[in-house]
From Swiss-Prot:
GO molecular function: 3-isopropylmalate dehydratase activity
Any one cellular-component term (Gene Ontology): 3-isopropylmalate dehydratase complex
Family membership noted in the UniProt record: Belongs to the LeuD family. LeuD type 1 subfamily.
Species whose genome carries this gene: Methylorubrum extorquens (strain PA1)
TM region(s), chain numbering: none
Gene it is expressed from: leuD
InterPro entries: 3-IsopropMal_deHydase_ssu, Aconitase/3IPM_dehydase_swvl, AconitaseA/IPMdHydase_ssu_swvl, IPMI_Swivel, LeuD
Role, per record: Catalyzes the isomerization between 2-isopropylmalate and 3-isopropylmalate, via the formation of 2-isopropylmaleate.
Hydrolase found in the keyword field: no
Name under which the protein is recorded: 3-isopropylmalate dehydratase small subunit
Pathway: Amino-acid biosynthesis; L-leucine biosynthesis; L-leucine from 3-methyl-2-oxobutanoate: step 2/4
Length: 201
């Protein structure tokens, strides 16, 4: 899993509440167990018209936001069914951070397992970030995970809270398997060293 240290890039605003996982990645894209290629289906019911053409009004189709790395979204993002394809689709599109006032618990946990930083902020701070993100190409946010800060385009800084375990895993690029290996590495090394001393074993 890619480490998350500092992320600098355009933030796309989505002033919509209760965006569920079916809107993030519709069910027709769930047939695969690969984590790649899902970016094309991200928000597809909003991104594309019935004839398959792009909806020019959707934020991620607008030139300023096509390469957004952060989403600033409405309350209760990621509600609905517990499909891990939702963070897979976000990551495949290039989204590394999502900021809201609240997330569905399962989606929130799945983000961390897939290298995406989900940040919870107050309604007042979210409104500031929406206003920053609505600047288009100038909507650059810098997220420093170690310092737990979000710096806006004018240099204003917001602080956010995060569980220390989740922070450690993201900073070090550890998913569940990586975390297990990281914790057990000394014991594994000791066992292998012991075996090396017993050439007859």
């Amino acid at each position: 899993m890619e480490k998350f240290t500092t992320l600098e890039g355009v933030a796309a605003p989505m002033r919509i509440i209760n965006i569920d996982t079916d809107r993030i990645i519709p069910k027709q894209y769930l047939k695969t167990i690969k984590r790649t290629g899902l970016g094309q289906g991200l928000f597809s019911e909003m991104r594309y018209n019935d004839d398959g053409s792009e909806n020019p009004d959707f934020v991620l189709n607008q030139p300023a936001y096509r390469h957004a790395k952060t989403l600033v979204v409405g309350d209760n993002f990621g509600c609905g069914s517990s499909r891990e394809h939702a963070p897979w689709a976000l990551a495949d599109f290039g989204i590394r951070c999502v900021i809201s006032t609240s997330f569905a618990d399962i989606f929130f946990n799945n983000c961390a397992k897939n290298g995406i930083l989900a940040i919870v902020v107050s309604p007042e701070d979210l409104e500031k970030l929406f206003q920053d993100a609505e600047r288009g190409a100038n909507a650059t946010l810098t997220i420093d995970l170690a310092a737990q800060t979000i710096k806006g385009p004018d240099g204003g800084t917001l602080h956010f809270d995060i569980d220390e375990g989740r922070k450690h895993n993201l900073l070090n690029g550890l998913d569940e398997i990586g975390l297990t290996l990281d914790q057990k590495a000394p014991a594994i090394d000791a066992y292998e060293a012991k075996l090396a001393q017993r050439e007859w074993a």
